[in-house]
Amino acid sequence: MSLFDLGGKTAIVTGAAGLLGRQHCQALAEAGAFVVATDSDRDTCAAVAEALGKSGIAIAADVTDPVSLRQLADAVRSLTGRIDVLVNNAAINDKFENPAAALEDSRFENYPLEMWKRSLEVNVTGVFLCSQVIGADMARAGRGSIINVASTYGVVAPDQSLYRDPEGRQRFYKTPVYPTTKGAVLAFTRFLAAYWGGAGVRVNALSPGGVENGQDDFFVAEYSRRTPLGRMAAPTDFRGAVVYLASDASGYMTGANLLVDGGFTAI
């Protein structure tokens, strides 16, 4: 079990205030790492760090701003002297403020260019910049693990029938940008793994399945029905995978995509 021990290591988690970001922070801290919880909102990431006690700290940063990320990296190195793990978790998953307009706005033919550009900026450029700024420090140190959080929708296309209620009415469509950006994250993961393999930095992706989080009952039931394990994921279901990818337990693993999806992509 010592292979999973992260004692003495420093981990940065972006999007730390999100549903899964909080879990990633907790898992890494429980494995012994000192965790830097990073989010664009200072107050929310401070609340995450507070829950970690002495095992973590909050430093707000904008993943789309290289100056902000350099300040983050410098602050972490000044504090702990090292960066061992980077979890690129920050991402946008489209939500439509007006439920009445969601169906039409989410159609591919109507999908707003502004939403497309914003998701590309955060979900793809954000991963690129965090890896470029923070990962470059890891490469210079000759060690590290980068974990890019992707999605099953980076592997398979969205099943639009999941968003259809029991009366057969399409509530909305899963939009094109989330699968596109998560597919890009997987390609970028392979690129970076090959590029930094000789520098001692491992780069892997973690692709979570759908997480139960207050969705309509019909969606939860239908998603569970088409998943071999018969349920959606709980937010805690990815803790072990994050620790595994961050630790020496996955020491001969790079350029891989670890699917933790209850078998969703197996059928």
Task: Give the predicted meaning of each segment.
Residues 97-108, 112-117, 160, 223:
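Substrate-binding pocket helix/loop in short-chain dehydrogenase/reductase
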Residues 33-47:
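Conserved glycine-rich Rossmann-like NAD(P)H-binding loop of the short-chain dehydrogenase/reductase
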Residues 131, 181-184, 189:
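Active-site helix of classical SDR
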Residues 42-43, 60-72, 113, 237:
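The beta1-alpha1 cofactor-binding region of Rossmann-like NAD(H)/NADP(H)-dependent oxidoreductases
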